[in-house]
Amino acid sequence: MGLANLGNRDLVDIGYLRKRFIDGEYAISDHAIIEARKDGIVPRTVEKLEWAAINGEVIEEYVDRKRVLIYAELKEEKLPVHIVVDYSFWEEPVIVTSYVPDSRYWIKYKIRKK
């Protein structure tokens, strides 16, 4: 339910994770909201972070930490955004941080530069 077991490795079921956000069964840390606002994701910050969680693309998985990095493009602001979602507790995933990625460190905001 939430995790698919492939041998020793548990992978996130992004469909299940998205459903938690669609159903309103999630949390957002104060830190994620503050960082989003500092980066210009205003007004309706929480709504925009929720939209990113539902519509974004998983670009990195941190299986050991039970977290994913999601990329989305906010159309209104014309801003790329990254959010980190912790799924340690499947019934209520948490957006733990958010930020506008820096192009010096990312290729098309999706691939980490070496």
Where do the model's predicted regions map?
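Ribonuclease/tRNase effector modules and their secretory precursors
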Residues: M1-K114
